[in-house]
Amino acid sequence: GDCHKFLGWCRGEKDPCCEHLTCHVKHGWCVWDGTI
């Protein structure tokens, strides 16, 4: 997947794109920080 356009899901099995990112708990996908 393209980690720049979509950072990946972090529900259950973490997407490799999420490795250095923050999981957005509400939406269940990865973001650069948790303020979105």
UniProtKB/Swiss-Prot annotation:
Molecular function per GO: ion channel inhibitor activity; potassium channel regulator activity; toxin activity
- Record's subcellular location: Secreted
Q: Which family does it belong to?
A: Belongs to the neurotoxin 10 (Hwtx-1) family.
Q: What does the UniProt record say this protein does? A: Selective inhibitor of voltage-gated potassium channel Kv10.1/KCNH1/EAG1 (IC(50)=637 nM). It acts by shifting the voltage dependence of channel activation in a depolarising direction. It shows a 100% inhibition at saturating concentrations, shows fast on-rates and is reversible. It also slightly affects channel inactivation, when the membrane is highly depolarised (>+80 mV).
Isoleucine amide modifications at: 36
Q: What is known of its domains?
A: The presence of a 'disulfide through disulfide knot' structurally defines this protein as a knottin.
One GO term describing the cellular component: extracellular region
UniProt tissue specificity: Expressed by the venom gland.
Q: Which InterPro entries match?
A: Huwentoxin-1
| Disulfide linkage | 3-18, 10-23, 17-30
Which SUPFAM superfamilies does the record cross-reference, listed alphabetically? omega toxin-like (SSF57059)
Swiss-Prot/TrEMBL keywords: Amidation, Disulfide bond, Ion channel impairing toxin, Pharmaceutical, Potassium channel impairing toxin, Secreted, Toxin, Voltage-gated potassium channel impairing toxin
**Its principal location?**
secreted
UniProt name for this protein: Kappa-theraphotoxin-Aa1a
A further note on this protein reads: Weakly inhibits Nav1.2/SCN2A (IC(50)=1449 nM), Nav1.7/SCN9A (IC(50)=1528 nM), Nav1.5/SCN5A (IC(50)=7316), and Kv11.1/KCNH2/ERG1 (IC(50)=8511 nM).
